[in-house]
């Protein structure tokens, strides 16, 4: 039986011998280097514009470095194993010194920014965040340098539900699907049977149900199997301890809400208002995470 405790702390294969085995040896890009840059920015521009339209967001700028004392940097997980890069700014010969950190994530900053920018209910922000995560295992999915979208939406207490989470996830999925169609229109060579399109439907499944389906596999292998079967899935309830005694993955306690009780479609008690969109990567032949998101914690959760 495989070690089910493996990979609980997060991303990265952590075994380069294993990584070398699974990386494809015959991959060639469908686009030239120039076309790749044009296509990349076409996708980024399309997704940014349409996320703002669908979710009522405005684009803002997020800081690259923050004051340690501000408390707005993120630790990425709940065991403190991933620490940020920190450095001292003497600032006028140490008369006004600052101990600074490079951001690892903008989760806390975004919540503060909603208030700073005066966002009302149903309004939000989108930012293109750059960060350094020095303690990641580096592989074909993960880098120490992060360039990702971060967004935050102000919601009501009543909207803190699994139903609303799914509603937002489905809106985001439609944006991703339409971005796929748009870039294929610009670069028709991207539409090929070798690399099939993302499925139209995104399947929602709780981490507990994946454990039931693949009880002898560790987390990443479970994710790979379900992604291969479904093509695309939103796995929710990540962080709560499952029936085997382990969480699907450890998650920080001050990020998304993986504690709140929910109910499955067939009436079983579950936990968690967070999750990841995973797709089947036809190049690497394994799961690929597109986004991790969720309803934020409250003082109670």
Predicted feature residues:
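Extended, charged alpha-beta segments that form solvent-exposed binding/catalytic grooves
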Residues: 122, 127-219
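Active-site-proximal structural scaffolding
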Residues: 40, 44, 144, 165, ...
């Amino acid at each position: 039986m495989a070690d089910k405790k493996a990979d609980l702390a997060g991303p990265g294969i952590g075994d380069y011998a294993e990584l070398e085995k699974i990386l494809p040896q015959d991959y060639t890009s469908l686009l030239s280097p120039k076309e790749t840059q044009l296509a990349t920015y076409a996708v980024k521009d399309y997704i940014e514009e349409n996320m703002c339209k669908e979710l009522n967001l405005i684009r803002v700028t997020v800081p690259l470095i923050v004051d340690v004392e501000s408390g707005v940097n993120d630790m990425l997980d709940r065991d403190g194993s991933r620490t940020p890069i920190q450095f001292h700014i003497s600032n006028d010969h140490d008369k006004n010194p600052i101990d600074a950190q490079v951001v690892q994530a903008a989760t806390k900053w975004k919540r503060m920014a909603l208030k700073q920018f005066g966002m009302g209910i149903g309004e939000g922000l989108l930012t293109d965040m750059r960060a350094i995560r020095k303690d990641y295992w580096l592989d074909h999915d993960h880098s120490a340098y992060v360039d990702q979208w971060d967004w935050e939406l102000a919601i009501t207490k009543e909207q803190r539900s699994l139903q609303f989470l799914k509603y937002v996830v489905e809106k985001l999925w439609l944006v991703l699907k339409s971005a796929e169609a748009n870039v294929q229109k610009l670069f028709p060579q991207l539409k090929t049977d070798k690399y099939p399109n993302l499925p139209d439907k995104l399947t929602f499944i709780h981490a507990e149900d994946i454990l039931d389906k693949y009880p002898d596999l560790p987390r990443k292998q479970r994710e790979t199997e379900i992604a291969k079967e479904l093509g695309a899935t939103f796995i929710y309830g990540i962080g709560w301890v499952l029936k085997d005694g382990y969480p699907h993955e450890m998650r920080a306690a001050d990020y998304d809400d993986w504690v709140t009780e929910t109910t499955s479609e067939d009436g079983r008690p579950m936990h968690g208002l967070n999750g990841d969109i995973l797709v089947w990567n036809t190049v690497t032949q394994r799961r690929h995470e597109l986004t991790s998101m969720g309803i934020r914690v409250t003082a109670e959760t």
